[in-house]
Amino acid sequence: MRVSRLMLVTLRDVPADAEIASQQLLIRGGFIRRVGSGIYAYLPLMWRVLQRVMRIVREEMNQIGALETLLPQLQPAELWEKSGRWQGYTAGEGIMFHLEDRQERSLGLGPTHEEVITELASDLLRSYRQLPVTLYQIQSKFRDEIRPRFGLMRGREFIMKDAYSFHGDEGDLARMYEEMEKAYTRVFQRCGLTAVGVDADSGAIGGAASQEFMVTADAGEDLILISPDGDYAANQEKAVSIAPPALPLPSGESRVISTPGQVTIDELCSAQSLHPSQVVKVLLLLAKLESGDEQPVLVCLRGDQELNEVKLVNALTQQLDSPVLDLSPINADQVKTQGLQPLPLGSIGPDLSDHSLAGARSWKERFYKLADTTAAELERFVCGANTSNEHRWGASWSDLGTIPAMDLRNAKAGDHCVHRPEQSLEERRGIEVGHIFQLGRKYSLSMGAQITTKEGKQEHLWMGCYGIGISRLAQAAVEQHHDDAGIIWPLSIAPFQVIVVVANVQDEVQMALGEEIYNELLASGIDVLLDDRGERAGVKFKDADLIGIPWRVVVGRAAAEGNVELVKRSERDANVLSRAEAISSLLEAIPTELRIQL
């Protein structure tokens, strides 16, 4: 390929709306262009990168026996209603684009395909003899993101590989889950990425077990916690830890103290000479459920800990037998709208009476109370007295009443590891590029997907699902591999492996040597780009650095002696070599398996 025919348009200035380095470089390098909020066009260079990523993914999926298919992007609402997820994905999280056709039938643009694939399995899989089977596809997905950002990292349309496996028993599902974990590890290694597998929350997809694959990068949206020995890693949403011990409250009789203007933990601790671990703070939240109920929730936390909303939502969904569509703090205006007397916000204690909800217009008239274990373990503490500007000093659970306790706090860096308490968790940022789930029977039960067992019984299928964000992975590679001058593509996914830069195309000797090297590399199966533009040499060199081709051959003044410069993009040191030496070096550096099959 010649640059003069590539439609390459690069930018010198950083786009104003590009927030992170990888997004800036992909736009500046002519890889992508923004079409709308969260919507990007993949230009020729980017499409070549994506094709290379997809090829690696396909090879690894095929290697473990998965079968490629293509499922419809438009999905009937009744399938999602059957699984119980339509309301949550349209009215709850609201991430599914949905529409009505001219017959007023509701349809959704698929953010995921569990419903479609389970419906197909219910129709096509009848006997244990057909199992196990794994199907996968690579196609565009859609999410109505509230705030699209970071280019391809969080867009409203993106390319994804999703796979679904079906099994006759839980053990076989666990075997495939392990196989898929190994395949994902190989995918990321082959793509030149440093990725770590972490325990993760199953989210709206559900299931018994799940693992995320995170590319470590400072720009990552996810916080991951890792043990120094590498034996434990988890997304903060899922992470568990041992919190530092609380400082004991000084002895003394239980009493009510005046705390005017001391609404926050910091204000209270500063005024009363307390440590936050000596305080139990109370959060009032409103959970809106798929069932239509509006449930007030009272949560108790130790003052030095933060609420993990994912853990709380999971607990409420399980205990209230209805998915939580929304969880938000209760404020004074909401209390007034419900026709209730003002609550002493900032001075609320764990024993706040349900009488304060009596006569609520739409809320349940009883608090659902939960406590984090670190709060429940305190023997004596300070908490709100349920009267404005007053707190209890020396309160105890025996006086206030027992509240069900569970892990509801955010684990954080510095906490002790559960598996080895002598170690402390460390913090990293990560970009999620893959996620695997053991779904169990969640979808087969709701959608009636059964097979006949060897014993002649009808049993519901066991399922797994496995996703890789293809377009996100490509940008994550840039986030991990770049410098001040531009992108440094890993060789395996680079749009081209070599770029031949002719410094002066008007010089016949330079141009002739450039063409010879270009053609010889092509004949050897090297994917090579020839910069034959009539631009100044400096412009070409800057563009070559920006677009990040792994190897550069510079044909300049030394062409008269038959010499060229060979530059590795990741090192940028130039070596003067003869034409034959340069070609020999490139053939040695680029493995046969990465070359074009001629």
UniProtKB/Swiss-Prot annotation:
Lineage: superkingdom: Bacteria
InterPro entries, per database record: aa-tRNA-synt_IIb, aa-tRNA-synth_II, aa-tRNA-synth_II/BPL/LPL, Anticodon-bd, Anticodon-bd_dom_sf, Pro-tRNA-ligase_IIa, Pro-tRNA-synth_IIa_bac-type, Pro-tRNA-Synthase_IIa_type1
Major place of residence: cytoplasm
One of the protein's GO biological processes: prolyl-tRNA aminoacylation
Keywords assigned: Aminoacyl-tRNA synthetase, ATP-binding, Cytoplasm, Ligase, Nucleotide-binding, Protein biosynthesis
EC number: 6.1.1.15
Keyword Protein biosynthesis: yes
A single GO molecular function term of this UniProt record: aminoacyl-tRNA deacylase activity
Compartments where located: Cytoplasm
PROSITE patterns: AA_TRNA_LIGASE_II
Gene3D superfamilies: Anticodon-binding domain, Bira Bifunctional Protein, Domain 2
Recorded GO CC terms: cytosol
Pfam families assigned to the protein according to its UniProt record, in alphabetical order: HGTP_anticodon, tRNA-synt_2b, tRNA_edit
Catalytic reaction equation(s): tRNA(Pro) + L-proline + ATP = L-prolyl-tRNA(Pro) + AMP + diphosphate
PANTHER family given in the database record: MITOCHONDRIAL RIBOSOME PROTEIN L39/PROLYL-TRNA LIGASE FAMILY MEMBER, PROLINE--TRNA LIGASE
NCBIfam families for the chain: PRK09194.1, proS_fam_II
Quaternary state and interactors: Homodimer.
Domain notes: Consists of three domains: the N-terminal catalytic domain, the editing domain and the C-terminal anticodon-binding domain.
The family this protein is said to belong to: Belongs to the class-II aminoacyl-tRNA synthetase family. ProS type 1 subfamily.
Main function: Catalyzes the attachment of proline to tRNA(Pro) in a two-step reaction: proline is first activated by ATP to form Pro-AMP and then transferred to the acceptor end of tRNA(Pro). As ProRS can inadvertently accommodate and process non-cognate amino acids such as alanine and cysteine, to avoid such errors it has two additional distinct editing activities against alanine. One activity is designated as 'pretransfer' editing and involves the tRNA(Pro)-independent hydrolysis of activated Ala-AMP.
Name by which UniProt lists this protein: Proline--tRNA ligase
